[in-house]
């Protein structure tokens, strides 16, 4: 039999074992599509971002007009920009659903894969933040000022740290230049960490909805899941294109149509929708350092999830009490997202504080208790 180049060539061999002959569980559902969708999002963002960067000027006096120029005068510049801006939203939708899947089906018990995933989330958040600042609109300028200023809450070195990050005493030219450099660099770092994420995943193989070993029943990734992923991709690209072509500014802030003005503050400073849950948690604590710590904890709490797993079963498939708790957590996050977009006044303040409290309580206290309770009910 002639040797198969797919299995013998040093580079094709890696692709083959990762994407073609990879043994995959036969019963993984559409919730397992989001990994490949995230990879497609990353590719789309890098390509559209590169095309935008060729027409962008990282200068406070020119940034806003260079983006306007891209939209008006560059061939399909409006489409590239709309795809890039809304592509970021879809990136976050996919990553939140991907994390939700991991929580529901106990994928976090693959600790290395989970931890690299959390690092990926943090890097993505950093990338989105520095990118949002670049077009120098009113909201993005003030968002950058407020969020970077949070570092001044760090005792002793805080103020020095902020001025070092800004490159001056306010968000100005040096800030924009370094944010552009970071925004260009970080997606490639994300791509690198993604490869590590996959390497760890392929050590153990995919989890499945039953949470049991699937060694006895594996199928090749191609053609089964490659085709399933293409369907998922089509189902994601359709709403992305619909959004980019029909209502590209739906998720943006109207304040960003005004060029940045350091002398006037917008009435309600708020980040993009995908950061609102964390922003609501930040605002719910009436103390700067406390708020910053809660903000950090709201994402870093994911690193504790593997240690809070007390159930003898891996997934929530057959654990109705944990399921109820999971969907309460999901609803809670939606409430936090809504609160983050509202002004700081009654009744939003108290709703935000209650939602923030229940967010941490659910994860840190209720999940382990319910897990233990279910063990007892099932006589484990």
UniProtKB/Swiss-Prot annotation:
UniProt-listed GO biological process terms: mitochondrial electron transport, ubiquinol to cytochrome c
Free-text function comment from the UniProt entry: Component of the ubiquinol-cytochrome c reductase complex (complex III or cytochrome b-c1 complex) that is part of the mitochondrial respiratory chain. The b-c1 complex mediates electron transfer from ubiquinol to cytochrome c. Contributes to the generation of a proton gradient across the mitochondrial membrane that is then used for ATP synthesis.
Binding of a ubiquinone, residues: 202
Free-text cofactor note: Binds 2 heme b groups non-covalently.
InterPro entries given in the database record: Cyt_b/b6_C (IPR005798), Cyt_b/b6_C_sf (IPR036150), Cyt_b/b6_N (IPR005797), Cytb/b6-like_sf (IPR027387), Cytochrome_b (IPR030689), Cytochrome_b_C_euk/bac (IPR048260), Cytochrome_b_N_euk/bac (IPR048259), Di-haem_cyt_TM (IPR016174)
Keyword Mitochondrion in record: yes
Subcellular localization, as worded in the UniProt entry: Mitochondrion inner membrane
A GO molecular function held by the record: metal ion binding
Binding site for heme b b562: 84, 183
Superkingdom of origin: Eukaryota
PROSITE patterns associated with the record: CYTB_CTER, CYTB_NTER
Subunit structure: The cytochrome bc1 complex contains 11 subunits: 3 respiratory subunits (MT-CYB, CYC1 and UQCRFS1), 2 core proteins (UQCRC1 and UQCRC2) and 6 low-molecular weight proteins (UQCRH/QCR6, UQCRB/QCR7, UQCRQ/QCR8, UQCR10/QCR9, UQCR11/QCR10 and a cleavage product of UQCRFS1). This cytochrome bc1 complex then forms a dimer.
Note, other: Heme 1 (or BL or b562) is low-potential and absorbs at about 562 nm, and heme 2 (or BH or b566) is high-potential and absorbs at about 566 nm.
Residues reported in the UniProt entry to bind heme b b566: 98, 197
Protein name: Cytochrome b
Membrane topology summary: Multi-pass membrane protein
Assigned protein family: Belongs to the cytochrome b family.
Keywords: Electron transport, Heme, Iron, Membrane, Metal-binding, Mitochondrion, Mitochondrion inner membrane, Respiratory chain, Transmembrane, Transmembrane helix, Transport, Ubiquinone
GO CC term (a single one): mitochondrial inner membrane
Annotated transmembrane regions: 34-54, 78-99, 114-134, 179-199, 227-247, 289-309, 321-341, 348-368
Pfam families (UniProt xref): Cytochrom_B_C, Cytochrome_B
UniProt source species: Callipepla gambelii
Entry cofactors: heme b
Encoding gene, per UniProt annotation: MT-CYB
